[in-house]
Swiss-Prot record:
Source species taxonomy: Bacteria, Bacillati, Actinomycetota, Actinomycetes, Micrococcales
Subunit field text: Component of the ClpX-ClpP complex. Forms a hexameric ring that, in the presence of ATP, binds to fourteen ClpP subunits assembled into a disk-like structure with a central cavity, resembling the structure of eukaryotic proteasomes.
A Pfam family: AAA_2
Coiled-coil ranges from the UniProt annotation: none
GO annotation terms (biological process): cell division; proteolysis involved in protein catabolic process
Species this chain originates from: Tropheryma whipplei (strain Twist) (Whipple's bacillus)
Binding site for ATP: 126-133
NCBIfam families: clpX (TIGR00382), PRK05342.1 (NF003745)
Name of the featured protein: ATP-dependent Clp protease ATP-binding subunit ClpX
Family annotation (InterPro entries): AAA+_ATPase, ATP-dep_Clp_protease_ClpX, ATPase_AAA_core, Clp_ATPase_C, Clp_protease_ATP-bd_su_ClpX, ClpX_bact, P-loop_NTPase, Znf_CppX_C4
């Protein structure tokens, strides 16, 4: 004799002939109506959980946005470390703020919301005028991983050299191999003008991997999941690899683009420009009028140009700017060397004429502010050799004569007498 309870739904109690289907399991049965009801309950609870999660994300988003430095604050921070370049600092401040605002927004994006595109940056300007330093200073302020790569070291597949993914390896290393942190970092690719197509830029001698590298960089600039060889160099199946999503990595691409002024000048009808011309001293006026077609004529492919919607120029540093670079920033060279001497209990001072002489020597090297450290080092190195072993020296003053002699003519004042070190 059959027990009717074996044919009842364990949840609603309906018999099998009262429902469409009755699904049986070990010691339990459920009818089709209860299955539908259960699915509705699960869906309601899921939607409720998603709503709570969305509210939490939005609260967190507001909190992060409140903590994100505003463009004016970013500009003020850059102003403490970088002399001049007001327009570039303003452009970068806005671009970086919008980038990280977009990054926060992306975490709570739904299908119905407007998707914010990434805006990578192209910095154009002469060597040694602060392109890489600007990017580095931004990363330091935002406390995000930062990496610098030299475009000339990159090659396309099939050539000796580094794959483009190696720029991401440097970023991953700076993030202590924390992929999540690396995916919100900043990458600066310098010397990008050196991988221009030779056909459109006769002055560029290297073309073995020019257009090929540009093509290889397209995906990581736009946003892709890249396989990064943890051993560096070329990708190999035997090497361990990490997957990094570049969608939220900010790329700052920089180059001197020597000669592009002439391309711009020709297009807008100005006379030819040379390094000594008055017009070149106002190079930002020319660069402000740069168009994608100028970059294409220089040798960048259209697809590559399209991945760099923000273009800003770095201006030449004149003598007055260089003196300010020496003395005004928080980590100015003069301040650094004064600190080094103070650790030996000696005060260090510079005459204004000495600073002018140092700048004059640096300008002759034609490498911008980079030359300042090497000039300062050549002058101060002999002094720094002697000072630590002398306990009677209270202060050291660098004069124009000191600079002219490369360091041997130096007046040091102490409590008892003047000590002059000569050649």
């Amino acid at each position: 004799m059959t027990d009717d309870t074996e044919y009842r739904c364990s949840f609603c109690g309906k018999e099998h002939h009262q429902v469409d289907d009755l699904i049986a399991g070990p010691d339990v049965r459920i009818c089709s109506e209860c299955v539908v009801l259960s699915c509705e309950i699960v869906e309601d609870r899921r939607n409720e959980a998603l709503a709570k999660q969305d509210a939490f994300i939005k609260r967190k988003q507001r909190s992060v946005l409140e903590g994100l430095p505003k463009p004016a604050e970013i500009y003020a921070f850059l102003d403490e470390y970088v002399i001049g370049q007001q327009k570039a600092k303003r452009d970068l401040s806005v671009a970086v703020y919008n980038h990280y605002k977009r990054l926060v927004s992306t975490k709570s994006e739904s299908e119905n919301e407007v998707e914010l595109s990434k805006s990578n940056i192209l910095l154009i300007g002469p060597t040694g005028c602060g392109k890489t330093y600007l990017a580095q200073t931004l990363a330091r302020m935002l406390r995000v991983p930062f990496a610098v790569a030299d475009a000339t070291a990159l090659t396309e597949a099939g050539y000796v050299g580094d794959d483009v993914e190696n720029v991401l390896l440097k970023l991953l290393q700076d993030a202590d191999f924390d992929i999540t942190r690396a995916e919100a970092g900043i990458v600066c690719i310098d010397e990008i003008d050196k991988i221009s197509r030779k056909a459109d830029s006769p002055s560029i001698t290297r073309d073995v991997s020019g257009e090929g590298v540009q093509q290889a960089l397209l995906k990581i600039l736009e946003g892709t999941v890249a396989s990064v060889p943890l051993q560096g160099g070329k990708k190999h199946t035997q090497y361990e690899q990490a997957s990094i999503n570049t969608r939220n990595i900010l790329f700052i691409v920089a180059g001197a683009f020597s000669g592009i002024e002439e391309i711009i000048s020709s297009r807008i009808g100005r006379s030819n420009m040379g390094f000594g011309s008055d017009l070149l001293r106002k190079d930002t006026d020319v660069f402000d009028q740069i168009l994608p077609e100028d970059l294409r004529k220089f040798g960048l492919i259209p697809e590559f140009i399209g991945r760099l919607p923000i273009v800003t120029a770095i201006s030449h540093l004149d003598g007055e700017d260089m003196i300010r670079v020496l003395t005004e920033p928080k980590n100015a060279l003069v301040k650094q060397y004064k600190r080094l001497f103070s650790l030996d209990g000696v005060s260090l001072g510079f005459d204004h004429e000495a600073l002018e002489a140092i700048v004059e020597l640096a300008l002759k090297r034609k490498t911008g502010a980079r030359a300042l450290r090497s000039v300062m080092e050549s002058i101060l190195s002999p002094i720094m050799f002697d000072v630590p072993s002398r306990g009677d020296i209270e202060s050291v003053r660098i004069t124009a004569e000191t600079v002219a002699g490369g360091g041997p003519h130096l007046t040091m004042r102490c409590a008892r007498s003047n000590y002059i070190r000569s050649a």
